[in-house]
Structure formats: C-alpha cells, structure tokens
Amino acid sequence: MSQHPHVTTVDRMTKAVLGGDAETLGTILSNDFRFHYRGPYPKPGDYTGPDGLLEVIGEIVKATKGDIDLEQQFCVATDGWVAEWEHAVLGREGRHLESDNAFVYRFDRDRIAEMWMFIGAPPGSEAFFV
C-alpha cells in the first residue's frame, strides 16, 4: 500500500522545521498558514505564517541543542486532513523529557493550511526548559 501524499508532506514538514529550513517550509505551508500550539513547552499560543512555527520549534531545538528523538506512532490522511501521533524524547543537560504528542493538519489542496500541536508531557514539564 502506498503512502498518502499528505503524509509525505507532513514528514517533509517535520524535517524542514527541525532543520530550520524556511525555504522548504515556504513550499509546504500555505500563504495564510495558521499554527495552534498547546502544552507545557515554551511559547504556547496561536501563530500565523511559517515564522511562528519556526520560532516555537526553534526554541525547543535551542533549549535541547538538537537532542530530540521523535518516533512517529502513526500518521493517517483522508480528504484534506491528516492526524499524527508521535513519541518524543528531549534531552537537556543530562535530563530527559518524554511526551506523547498529537497533531492535526488541515490541507488546502497540497499545502498545509492549519496545524494543531498538542504536547502530552506530564505536569511540571515546564521546569525542563528553565
């Protein structure tokens, strides 16, 4: 069975975000992209445009010095929607933080128009970033 093209796009987006690749994100995200981010990681809130997504993920990459291990549990697509679940392990100064995170993506044709990111880290996880 082949992979849905929107799943491929989500995988490309993840790689681009973690790599800070704004040029690739410009081809993946719609011009009016919206990002909704909830959880105990830095900078929760609502953002417009790829810069907001890069700002949020950039803070996490900076705090962990890139010590981020993501394991996609599933990623499924139908019509203009994608749902994804991942297990993340972040490392910082000899400590580790694990979370199970949920993502929902709304597509406009072949580009991501809106993204919801919900961090499933345990209570008190904010201290990991201080």
Predicted regions: what is each one?
Residues T24-T78:
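A solvent-exposed, acidic/Ser-Thr-rich amphipathic alpha-helical stretch
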Residues S2-P5, L54-V130:
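A beta-strand edge to alpha-helix "cap/lid" segment located at domain peripheries
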Residues T8-L18, P40-P44, G58-K62, W85:
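Short, mixed-charge, low-aromatic patches
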